[in-house]
């Protein structure tokens, strides 16, 4: 079973020793159409964007204006209606997929953990990349060479244990951290 979630932030349990936890809000979603093999077309609310294509889908599936986004998910529902969140109550582990924090154009020390050069005694190397290849052979930069560039803002999937699930408020508490900023949007999949 898959669910759409929004990251609330991190906290910790009151027990001794305390456990670091991440809070996720399970988004309200409506199953529009069951597609077979356990998958379904699901509508959810995000922002206020709307165009004629979205309005046509809202009319077709008799949805209110707030449900303006669509996704294909594995669901427990056998028919159209509100998405069933009951499987989360019995779940033990989930796979969480979110975008990591974007860090922009970053140097090799931050992006790839390069050691850098000496900072004193007249050195100019400091945080620079240094040599990126040999001389006549191979006469080019090898593919996959670690260099400065865009860091972060990529999809990452991790597995976490479920600590608790508040079905009334749809808040899922996971052990440990997950990628992404507070308010990040992603999806979870029940593993077992």
From Swiss-Prot:
Source taxon at top rank: Bacteria
One record GO biological process: translation
Keyword list, A-Z: Ribonucleoprotein, Ribosomal protein, RNA-binding, rRNA-binding
Coiled-coil ranges (or none): none
Signal peptide (UniProt feature, chain positions): none
GO molecular function annotations of the record: rRNA binding; structural constituent of ribosome
InterPro entries the record matches: Ribosomal_uL3, Ribosomal_uL3_bac/org-type, Transl_B-barrel_sf
GO CC annotation, single: cytosolic large ribosomal subunit
SUPFAM superfamilies reported in the protein's UniProt record: Translation proteins
One Pfam family from the record: Ribosomal_L3
Stated role: One of the primary rRNA binding proteins, it binds directly near the 3'-end of the 23S rRNA, where it nucleates assembly of the 50S subunit.
Subunit text: Part of the 50S ribosomal subunit. Forms a cluster with proteins L14 and L19.
Family, per entry: Belongs to the universal ribosomal protein uL3 family.
Protein name: Large ribosomal subunit protein uL3
Provenance organism: Wolinella succinogenes (strain ATCC 29543 / DSM 1740 / CCUG 13145 / JCM 31913 / LMG 7466 / NCTC 11488 / FDC 602W)
